[in-house]
Regions:
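Extended, helix-rich architectural segments
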Residues: 1-138
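C-terminal amphipathic alpha-helical
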Residues: 34, 105-114, 119, 123-124, ...
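Generic detection of long, well-ordered alpha-helical segments
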Residues: 85-92, 101-105, 234, 238-245, ...
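Short coil/turn segments at secondary-structure boundaries
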Residues: 87, 110-112, 126-127, 260-267, ...
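Generic structural marker for isolated residues within well-ordered, non-membrane alpha-helices
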Residues: 95, 314, 365, 410-411
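Extended, regular secondary-structure scaffolds
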Residues: 112, 116, 122-228
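Extended, charged amphipathic alpha-helical segments
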Residues: 202-341, 383
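Activation/maturation switch segments at domain boundaries
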Residues: 398-447
């Protein structure tokens, strides 16, 4: 008789135990392995993922993952950003110091990259008395942590388990079958599990130390690659790219081996009797017995058809990742508007990410202020680098006309291109450029 189990019959377990068991969950293990594989593909470590038919096959790989992921991560933090804070002067001054200490735009550029590769990145503010602001922001990508979800709000977490593999020498006297010494290495999982109440360190399944969490909350801000409904860890867009990249590598390897086989000119012999041999005269001819035949094996590898299919997969790869090929390899359009249309999918990615990252940065800022015991800020406006997203905008098409009609001024345009520049500095640069251009025009007229 089947047994019906009810949630009412089970014993409750602590949040720490839930986070501990989540680390050993099979699906969680596969998720982390996929995240690591995405990173390997991005950094060009792809040969180990190619399936070889035999030892005579050499893997051929082409790293398409890196340019596509890099393009998606070049949208937000391509230059130092201007941030407008709404809050108390003391809180704003402290945030600016912490951001300066941590080189925030460079750090968040890495956050963006690893969120694309692994699905999520946690930024963890920790105390560092060696820094002027005494806060260091530590990055953990989704291959380095597990989470115990909140049943009421699965988009949040009740616990975070920071994980790493610990290797320890347990026996240095081991000897292999050929007489060589082979030290025995034991690998265990080291976990630091954070809950609202405690911070517990595990080595394997043993508790090393457990301390109260004096903050009373989880000091982590979750930057997601792509938000997933009712999930704390986001989706890594690099997974789509990596899987198609894997198929392309496999096809390239097959083609390379086929060409290698074909260049060897395989010959098929038939009609031989027992004991008869083939005499080969290098560079001239082959002697075969009477009645026997020798034919060149036509492999018919259909190389061009295979290359066409690879090109099709490559095109689909760019399309499914919302990175138009023109944005990576370059290209021209008949007008700025045509280029805008072709770049539009990437522009939509920029808009969606900018909206989310503005929220993430707001959460990060207020978490830093909470840890420091300062008043939270009310609002944050980030001047994202829109000018670097498209090769040409409709405003650029009409810029000369707008200046002539006094809709905008050259000083406005200088400040748009460099938001850090004040109006006085922009005016000074305009006057300097105008003077230099006038001198060059006079020189050209004399010549």
């Amino acid at each position: 008789m089947p047994t019906n189990f009810s949630a009412w019959d089970s014993l409750p377990i602590s949040t720490t135990q839930r986070a501990f068991s989540e680390t050993y969950n099979l699906e969680e293990k596969e998720r982390k392995e996929a995240a690591d594989l995405n990173k390997n593909y991005y950094y060009g470590k792809q040969e180990g993922d190619v399936v070889l038919m035999n030892d005579d096959v050499n893997p051929i790989t082409m790293n398409i993952t890196k340019p596509i992921v890099s393009k998606r991560c070049s949208l937000l933090y391509s230059r130092p950003l201007v941030r407008e804070w709404d809050g108390s002067p003391r809180s704003i001054a402290y945030l600016e110091q912490v951001y300066k200490d941590n080189k925030i735009d460079s750090l968040l550029g890495k956050v963006d990259l690893y969120a694309e590769l692994t699905g999520s990145v946690l930024l963890h503010p920790t105390i560092d008395e060696n820094l002027p602001g005494q806060i260091r922001l530590v990055l953990y990508d989704a291959s380095e942590f597990s989470s115990a979800g909140n049943d009421d709000d699965p988009n949040t977490a009740d616990a975070i388990a920071l994980t790493r593999i610990l290797s320890r020498l347990v026996d240095s006297s081991g000897v292999t079958s050929d007489g060589r010494r082979q030290p025995q290495i034991e690998k265990t999982i080291l976990q630091q599990i954070w809950t609202n109440d405690a911070v517990t360190m595990y080595e394997g399944n043993q508790v090393v130390v457990s301390e109260p969490n004096e903050l009373g909350f989880l000091p982590f801000v979750n930057f997601q690659g792509e938000e997933v409904h009712n999930a704390y860890v986001g989706y890594p867009m690099a997974t789509i790219v990596r899987k198609l990249n894997s198929h392309i590598n496999q096809l390239l390897t097959h083609i390379g081996y086929t060409i290698k086989m074909q260049s060897g000119t395989p010959i098929v012999f038939s009609g031989f009797k027992s004991g008869e041999t083939v005499v080969v005269h290098p560079g001239r001819a082959i002697n075969i017995p009477e009645g026997a035949t020798a034919n060149v094996l036509n492999l018919d590898p259909k190389i061009q058809e295979s290359l066409d299919f690879i090109k099709y997969l490559e095109d689909r790869l760019y399309t499914t990742s919302s990175v138009p090929k023109i944005t990576v390899e370059g290209g021209e359009g008949r007008s700025g508007r045509e280029l805008m249309v072709r770049w539009f999918p990437l522009w939509k990615v920029f808009q969606e990410k900018a909206n989310r990252y503005n929220i993430y940065e707001m959460q990060l800022a207020n978490m830093i202020l909470t840890i420091a015991g300062l008043e939270p800020i009310n609002d944050l406006k980030i001047h994202w680098p829109e000018e670097s997203i498209l090769p040409l905008s409709s405003a650029d098409d009409n810029l000369e006309r707008d200046i002539k009609l006094n809709i905008v001024s050259p000083i406005d345009e200088i400040m748009r291109r460099d938001p850090h520049m004040s109006e006085i500095d922009a005016e000074a640069e305009y006057m300097l450029n105008a003077s230099q251009n006038a001198m060059l025009n006079q020189t050209n007229q004399v010549l």
